[in-house]
Amino acid sequence: MDPSSKKVTGRLMLAVGGAVLGSLQFGYNTGVINAPQKVIEEFYNQTWNHRYGEPIPSTTLTTLWSLSVAIFSVGGMIGSFSVGLFVNRFGRRNSMLMMNLLAFVAAVLMGFSKLGKSFEMLILGRFIIGVYCGLTTGFVPMYVGEVSPTALRGALGTLHQLGIVVGILIAQVFGLDSIMGNADLWPLLLSVIFIPALLQCILLPFCPESPRFLLINRNEENRAKSVLKKLRGTADVTRDLQEMKEEGRQMMREKKVTILELFRSPAYRQPILIAVVLQLSQQLSGINAVFYYSTSIFEKAGVQQPVYATIGSGIVNTAFTVVSLFVVERAGRRTLHLIGLAGMAGCAVLMTIALALLERLPWMSYLSIVAIFGFVAFFEVGPGPIPWFIVAELFSQGPRPAAIAVAGFSNWTSNFIVGMCFQYVEQLCGPYVFIIFTVLLVLFFIFTYFKVPETKGRTFDEIASGFRQGGASQSDKTPEELFHPLGADSQV
């Protein structure tokens, strides 16, 4: 392998670092709304009282709060489905740059909602930042995947998930009552998102456009070559250019790929099914349910400040994403995803047993804590980071934007459904709710084992051609070559 293929240059890290600021925004806005719930609800009550001269009815308060939380996912669904509209017209980098306008508008609306005595401003701000985050979950993995050398694509792709979990952790810390999660500073807590947006606006103009976009979509070979030299830190980028040109020639032979075509064409049907199921394996794994349960479990275990224990789980979240970052190019995507799913299923069983026996055996709360940390750790080994960047790997340049839009929409929709339904299912099933997630995790494990190929070390065109052959004749590759057994390596 060419030594330059694993070289991490300053320009490459600037490009990836500038992009994943958007991932940090996604994580921050996912986690920020939980801590200040009580003080924001009190703001809703005061606003209602100021307008109508009476306290807000409890059902109205519950509805407004649920809307404040859920509207973020609705915005995300709309944003994720719109990815292709921007990246093909404006490019990957410019799309990320333009979308910061949404972050600034959202920051102003949420930051001044208390001053304006308007909960509508806060809810609208949550919707707008949701649209921004939906777009970001498409833009960032696509851009990072296209600027990264093949040998580093998995490791750098994991930085998207690292940005998300760091954002969640920052939100948990900033949301402490002693910092910004109080009646005076919660507007600042919600509007501080203007800082990473401003930083991204400063950095992105110095980042290169995706060389694949320049060559394949714009046919600007000289610019693509110049960008590649800076990204790779070498004057000889012939191999990269040839691989992109081959992908471009293949794209010219294909008709324009729409979202409907992804499901109609045999060449795309299997990879889009894999992309959607992997996104579902992330959101339907039960990770949100675990965070929902964590505070009450820590309280039962006698933890004086359960919020700090919840932050501890956020630190575990971050630490194991870093672990995944270093092993993804060695172990492979498929292997890590399988290990993560299996580990989560085991921890879900432990959690079910511990929660069911908690009243009779108080020490079971400690087993619950171990199971929670284990569940979070295994999530970040596989189902957390892998689904985001493997979608970009499964498709060539032509269908990639449409595929990422479909996958992102699936992720946000399932996130919304879990957020809306979990409370009711938990009331119905009690501690046995994790049996549902255990069954789902086992099903996702079986699907991954039999259907998901290892993409480590393969170029985009090699992966796509494997599916084309699989969908057509299987003449050049056997199923064993395309769908490696657990832990198999795919050398180019």
Swiss-Prot record:
GO molecular function: D-glucose transmembrane transporter activity; dehydroascorbic acid transmembrane transporter activity; fucose transmembrane transporter activity; identical protein binding; kinase binding; long-chain fatty acid transmembrane transporter activity; xenobiotic transmembrane transporter activity
Name of the protein in question: Solute carrier family 2, facilitated glucose transporter member 1
Catalytic activity: D-glucose(out) = D-glucose(in)
Function: Facilitative glucose transporter, which is responsible for constitutive or basal glucose uptake. Has a very broad substrate specificity; can transport a wide range of aldoses including both pentoses and hexoses. Most important energy carrier of the brain: present at the blood-brain barrier and assures the energy-independent, facilitative transport of glucose into the brain. In association with BSG and NXNL1, promotes retinal cone survival by increasing glucose uptake into photoreceptors. Required for mesendoderm differentiation.
Database matches in CDD domains: MFS_GLUT_Class1
Residue positions the entry lists as glycosylated: N45
Keywords annotated in UniProt: Acetylation, Cell membrane, Glycoprotein, Membrane, Phosphoprotein, Sugar transport, Transmembrane, Transmembrane helix, Transport
Activity regulation note: The uptake of glucose is inhibited by cytochalasin B. Glucose uptake is increased in response to phorbol ester 12-O-tetradecanoylphorbol-13-acetate (TPA) treatment: TPA-induced glucose uptake requires phosphorylation at Ser-226.
Sites of N-acetylmethionine modification: M1
Membrane-side (Extracellular) residue stretches: 34-66, 113-120, 177-185, 294-306, 356-365, 423-429
Organism (species): Mus musculus (Mouse)
Subcellular location: Cell membrane; Photoreceptor inner segment
Cytoplasmic side: 1-11, 88-90, 145-155, 207-271, 329-334, 389-401, 451-492
GO terms under cellular component: apical plasma membrane; basolateral plasma membrane; caveola; cortical actin cytoskeleton; cytoplasm; cytosol; female germ cell nucleus; female pronucleus
